[in-house]
Amino acid sequence: MSHNRAKMHFLSKIILKLLKKSSLKKLSSSPNSAIGGSIKIGDFCNFSFYPNAKKISIGSGFSIRNYCNILVSNNAELHIGNNVFMNNYCSINCLEKIEIGENTLFGEGVKLYDHNHQYSASPDFKVEHQKFNSAPIKIGKNCWLGSNVIVLKGVTIGDNVIIGAGCVIHKDIPSNSMIINKQEHIVKNL
């Protein structure tokens, strides 16, 4: 039984290597892309670059851990600076433009959305599945976004910003700031 287990372990390592090579090929084969050196890609990452993406640039020293997703739609731009680190389960969803400054760190589960679904309230409430409103996201350099931070469309985050875990960012944040999510509010005493 241990021989079979060793074979399976060996095969799974080969499959993971092939998946990583495929991910790197996707990154570098996009016609409007510029990719720096020393890029590290974790396991089970997904890159969806539409054929008519306007521009994709990823700086040197980019490191992305496991189970991350990056989507860049047609006519969209993604710019990632040098030495950016994304931890496990991060997601970038770019329909217009997202910029991430150099030396920025993402904790686990960080999500960036430069768009939201269009909807109408009358005569009947309806959310559109394939129609979106979008606005660029810009994250400065030397930032740290804690675990499970969500950044919504139209936000600019300055340089040297720390955002605590679990924050939903829907407004601009000036440089040299720290944002925390206060959750000490007691709803009911038992």
Question: Residue spans of the language-model regions?
Answer:
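Domain-scale signature associated with acetyltransferase and cell-envelope carbohydrate enzymes
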Residues: 1-113, 134-145, 149, 159, ...
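Conserved coupling/switch loop of ABC ATPases
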Residues: 96, 153, 171
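Proline-centered turn/helix-capping motifs that create local helix->coil transitions or kinks
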Residues: 112-121
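Short glycine/proline- and charge-enriched loop/turn segments
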Residues: 120-130
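Glycine-rich, flexible loop/turn motifs
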Residues: 128, 133, 169, 175
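Short beta-to-alpha loop/turn elements within the nucleotide-binding domains of ABC transporters
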Residues: 155, 167, 173
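Binuclear metal-ion centers of metallo-dependent hydrolases, dominated by the metallo-beta-lactamase
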Residues: 163
